[in-house]
Amino acid sequence: EIASCLVGSEMCIRDSLRTEHGLDLPRRLQIEFSTIVQRRTDTAGGEVTPAQLWEAFVDEYLPNPDPSKRWGRYGFRGLTQHSEGEGTDRIAVQLRVEDHESTIEGLGNGPLDAFVKALASRGVKVRILDYAEHALSEGDDSLAAAYIEAEIGESIYWGVGIDGSITRASLQALISALNRAARAGIL
């Protein structure tokens, strides 16, 4: 168990998130999150607890289920996916944009590519630069974590998704990146 980390210690931050929450962040996401922790944390004493790290991580990357604390322009409501032959998927994603719900559809080389194309049909241009995923524990009922590095506008944003379905986790990771871009005023 990790008692506290020096602010800015990427290794301690990585180990805390791995030990406490099962997350294995890609290297560039570790670097980005370390910078966020430095920016957000009161550095009196130069240390941050695992609980403070997790709070910062959730606030930055994960949707809050409490509607009064929800941030971000986009929200994931559900999806329907159909395989249409070798390497082609059709996806319909129920999406909240601001306070309006709609369904967007796309066809692509897998569900993530189909979602990117569905977003493009609505004028939201995204380019996936990196993608990683893993199970958070062993067993059939394990949650999956997905990490996406995306170019949105001319900026790079990481997103994180956690779900029982790797497809939903992947789409949520992309929505996380979109919401971070919206928070920064890009969208």
Model regions: which residues?
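Polyanion-binding surfaces on beta-sheet-dominated domains and ring/shell assemblies
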Residues: 21-22, 30, 35, 39-187
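Single conserved hydrophobic/aromatic residue that forms the stacking wall/gate
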Residues: 1-8, 13
